[in-house]
Structure formats: C-alpha cells, structure tokens
C-alpha cells in the first residue's frame, strides 16, 4: 500500500493540517491524525490514510498473528482444495452492516466484482487479478487516455471465479494455484459492501463514498468532511472484537508540523509519523509517549518510463550511486530509519541483504562517469507530497546528487499525496517521484507484483518486464512457501539489474501520543491498534 499503504499494499503517504472543533473531544473518544485520503471505497483505497479510516469501518476476513500468518476474523474458516486453486470461505454468522443489512457471501461477490471491473477504474483492481475471469473484465483503450477513441466494453462484468454458495459460504476459483492466497484476504480491497452501496447492479450509489456503510466496529457519524475530518462511533452489540473507545475523530492535516504542534498541545491523541524536524525534541516534548516500533515501510524514488531522459539504465544507476543513504539516515532521520539496499522489507520471509549491490553503494566517482557517459539530463527534480515529512530528506538527497553529478537538482512539493499520484497517473513530467510502500499482506510477492508487474496497482512509473512478470506468477503458483520465495528472489534480482526505482530507506514507526490515552501501538502496516487504545481515566 502506498505511503503508502497502504497497499494498500498501500503506498505510504505521510500525515499532513486541519481545523476541527472535534479535535478537543473528551469523554471516551480519541483523535488520530491523518492526511486527506485519496479514496474511501475499499477497492479504490491503496494508500495508508484511507486504509486507516477503513480499518475502523470494516472487519476483514483475516488478520495476522505475530508470525505474519493469516488468522480468520470475519471468516470462520478459509480452506483450499488440493490444488490451491479453489478456496472456500465460511463466514461467521451474526455480522451486520451499519445500516442493519446482514453480511452475506453475496456482499463479497458484489464488492469484488465492482472492484475488478476495468471501466470502474478502481486502484486496487490488480489485487483481484488472480481470480478466474479477471482478464475478461478488462479492456484496453486503443489510443490511450488522451486519444479520441474510447475503450470497448469488456467481455464480461462479473468474475467467473466468484460464487456465493449460500449466505455464509463463498467459493473462490483462481486462474492458477496460489498457496498463499489466504494472506491477500486481509487487505482493504477485499472488504464487503452492502446492497445499499449500489444504485443498480454493479453501479455505485451516488454519495456512498462520503457516507461509507461498513461491517466493522465503528460506523460513520455524519459524512466525510474533506480536508477536515472523518468521525466514527462505536457500533452497539458488535459481534467481533470490541474496541475500548467509543469513537474516533480522524483529523485531517495538510501539514505534519501543525499536526505535531496539536499533539504536544494535547489537541491530538495520536500521530503515527513524527515529523523529521521534531525528532530531536520529541523525547523532551513527549517523554515516554514518544515511541518506536517496527513497520514494513520501504521508501524509494521511481523513474517514470514516460520520461525518456531516464530510459538509459546508466542514468538510473548513477543517480542511485550519487546518494549517501547512511549520511541521510544518520543526519536527517537521526537513526529513525535505516538504509535500504534491497527491494523488499526485512520484515517479510525471503528478504536478503544488499540485493541491490553496487548500484546502492555510495560511489560519487563512478556515478559521475556513468552519468556523463549516458549523457544524463542537466537538471533533475524529485517530486514529493508536502503533506508528509519529506522536504528535509529530499533537499538533502538533491544536494548529494548536485555534488556528485554536477547537475542541478530541486525538490518539488505537491500539496497532497493524492495530488502527486494524480499527476503521475496522468503522466505529467514530475521527474523522480517520491514513493513509499507499506505491505498489504505479509508476503515478499506484495513488494514485487503491485509495484513492478505490468499493470501493477501501484506501478505508477510504468515498468514492464515479461520475465519479471513470469517469475512473480511462478512464485504464486509454487507448491510451497520455500519454492515461492526462490522464484520471487529471482524476480528481485531483475530489479537490481534494471533499477526502475532507487531503494532509499526501510522505515520504522516513530509515533507519539497524548497524556489522555494509553495502550497505544502502531503495527507493521502503520496502523494504530484501534481495539487496544483506551482513554486514561
């Protein structure tokens, strides 16, 4: 997820400032800071801000234990056949949506069909691609988005691999075996939607996104107040795990420094990402309420393939070699992040140190030789989202690139993460793009397929390599986790040669909370544990 990820399998976004009377809420409610979500429809939510809000409104089929194994939550059981191609999901009885509708298997079928149908333009559509019939729900615009021709209607509107056997039984047939498929079902895009979400078959009801109806422990109070807040309140008689607080205000910020000021002043209860400029003072400001914990975040910059100045691999290698990762993590992040020299996070099985090799080693002399030989561009820019804590490290990175390559480099801030993604999706000349990734599910594949596979949900730079795609798919179809990892490691080795992105840093959660709350934890997905946080009496 993009960060963000979200991601989704989520791109990691970072938090940004909002104004709200709710921020001073007392009683048994808490205020948590986020940036403006890009979307709140589950199948279109692939970044961390939206995913956090949806985690309060929905209850997933699975969650994950301490060893990252999937554990049924809304599901009673998830069982594959002998081929790992047909999966049967039994639902726990008694769950309802916030409007009183019972949660049945057909709700999952309808939501997933909507998410998978190409013309609906859902950002998480890729995650349904392993289900039989997905290809027939897609169509290709013959002359691109800018051309006058329109894409033809897909061959089908519904996945052949989805079947509601009865109200509590969902049968999923995959297009190929996938031994770890159950892990995907914990991701945001696999939430169910009620009948009320649709005005007709497959057509989303107008206004539903601003007043989401979920199946989770909290329900929306009012509507999504864009650039201000989303307020949720606890559901009475919820059949799943019950939170300790009665409500949450997701307060939306455009500036993470303003968010931190609210935290220190006691107007905000949790900030999941302390801004860089406040790291040095956070211990004094917050005491033991300044905390760190592992997360799955991977920070990188990508080279858009639609910008021809980056087409020579030597240009990409040179820029990577011009960056002193250790200096930035020590001096800018004060050790809160660590240099990344691989393309996946250390928290997942299959991680290997230094798969990037020499391309990720600081070597300004070799970088200059490569760049000059490739006739790299005289000017570079790194575009980032200003609603996250990125300016300081982007400026530091540009200074290193200037010194090593002798070219001008500037950081360009977009006000919101959503604005950055929109510009990239429209193929505007953004230069190098600041991106981050929080795993959607704990598999090595989640750092490969969505980010680099052809048509991947967060492959914003447009990278495509047939051999890479085949290896990722071969890993999915492998009979054992060990065989899968071997294939995925081969795929990662291709990235190390072609450098479609530059690995920069591995994250950890660096968060803080107010005196009003306790039992605050932030997990590998960069989400606050909404079931354990509580108000201090």
Residue ranges and their predicted role:
Residues 227, 372-439, 481:
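Ligand/substrate-recognition segments at binding pockets and active sites
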Residues 338-373, 386-392:
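Structural transition elements
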Residues 152, 329, 407-420, 426, ...:
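Extracytoplasmic/peripheral linker and loop segments enriched in polar/acidic and small residues
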Residues 146-149, 157, 167-168, 174-243, ...:
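Gly/Pro-rich hinge or "lid" segments in bacterial periplasmic/extracellular proteins
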Residues 206, 235-281:
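Ligand-site clamp/hinge motif
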Residues 104-113, 167-173, 177, 217, ...:
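Alpha-helical secondary-structure segments
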Residues 33-82, 113, 213:
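N-terminal lobe/hinge region of extracytoplasmic solute-binding protein
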Residues 76-132, 171, 262, 309:
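Aromatic- and charge-enriched surface segment that lines or borders ligand/interaction sites
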